[in-house]
């Protein structure tokens, strides 16, 4: 009797090896995310009568601050992986092997979206102040591109065989090579493809935010800032659930895979951001109601 075994398997982290330089999937996906995000954000800026060139102007600082924030956040909470003999890593450039601090080896994986959001927000606030742009409106323009970039970027985890969930035998199970498995699960071959769960969830959020963006000027319900707060709520809701499946969490007071005796950092931050989003929408609605009352009075 023939039994077909279906599962997902990464082809590896390398997209193209040209000999003198290696192009990895993670870096390629980040680049694709940036280009698509640039296109989408310019379209949305034009729809809000904001100079689309502002998107091009902020892009370099936004990329740098987001990547630095995401990497710093991860390294701080996983310092044991980057200290001592792991402080440096090898990098191939023009047929030569050079040593660089592991902190800068972003293409090897190890970034945290919450750190990227913090770094990016700092850059956005500074830019809006310097250009005298409404902060809430500008963030609403950028948010759809950010969540779409998160959806695309999650596939970098797939190619790197990282950020997967606990063992499973579901039809869409993900095969993980033994060298990438946690010690606790060496005897298991198949795991939850949490990268796929989050990628699809983020894609749904992107579609919902674009629909709301197109209705924002037609109703007072979706005031400037609504999209940003809804992003915090929806992304945090999905991330909290998905994080509970992962075997490589950043922990406070505990150790992976389950943060025994501690708490998963991403879940803690998700609760905070979810609550912040709810409070933000509450005050937006309160301000809208007060404005209507003053107008009617």
Curated annotation (Swiss-Prot):
One of its GO terms (molecular function) is phosphatidylglycerol-prolipoprotein diacylglyceryl transferase activity. The chain crosses the membrane at residues 20-40, 57-77, 105-125, 133-153, 193-213, 225-245, 266-286. It is a multi-pass membrane protein. It is found in: Cell inner membrane. It is an enzyme of class 2 (transferase). Pathway: Protein modification; lipoprotein biosynthesis (diacylglyceryl transfer). GO terms for biological process: lipoprotein biosynthetic process. Keywords: Cell inner membrane, Cell membrane, Membrane, Transferase, Transmembrane, Transmembrane helix. Its EC number is 2.5.1.145. GO terms for cellular component: plasma membrane. InterPro entries: Lgt. A 1,2-diacyl-sn-glycero-3-phospho-(1'-sn-glycerol) binds at residue 154. Pfam families: LGT. Belongs to the Lgt family. Catalyzes the transfer of the diacylglyceryl group from phosphatidylglycerol to the sulfhydryl group of the N-terminal cysteine of a prolipoprotein, the first step in the formation of mature lipoproteins. NCBIfam families: lgt. PANTHER family: PHOSPHATIDYLGLYCEROL--PROLIPOPROTEIN DIACYLGLYCERYL TRANSFERASE (PTHR30589:SF0), PROLIPOPROTEIN DIACYLGLYCERYL TRANSFERASE (PTHR30589). This is Phosphatidylglycerol--prolipoprotein diacylglyceryl transferase. It comes from Prochlorococcus marinus (strain MIT 9215). The lineage of its organism: Bacteria, Bacillati, Cyanobacteriota, Cyanophyceae, Synechococcales.
